[in-house]
């Protein structure tokens, strides 16, 4: 299931419901978390 944080966003961990925490878990390759569409 795609990460709801944003396009191309990958999560370090996912909840059992398939959603991810768009905080510290949000990673977008070598880009900053903001690039994933996470909350500022």
Swiss-Prot record:
Signal peptide: none annotated. It comes from the Eukaryota. The keyword Nucleotide-binding does not apply. The keyword Transmembrane helix does not apply. One of its GO terms (biological process) is response to metal ion. Induction: Strongly induced by cadmium, copper and mercury. InterPro entries: Metalthion_5. Keywords: Cadmium, Copper, Metal-binding, Zinc. GO terms for molecular function: metal ion binding. Pfam families: Metallothio_5. All cysteine residues are arranged in C-X-C groups. These are thought to be the metal-binding sites in other metallothioneins. This protein binds cations of several transition elements. It is thought to be involved in detoxification processes. Belongs to the metallothionein superfamily. Type 5 family. This is Metallothionein-1. It comes from Drosophila simulans (Fruit fly). The lineage of its organism: Eukaryota, Metazoa, Ecdysozoa, Arthropoda, Hexapoda.
């Amino acid at each position: 299931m795609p990460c709801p944080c944003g396009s191309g966003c990958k999560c370090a961990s996912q909840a059992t419901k398939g959603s991810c925490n768009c905080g510290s878990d949000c990673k977008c390759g070598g880009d900053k978390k903001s690039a994933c569409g996470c909350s500022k």
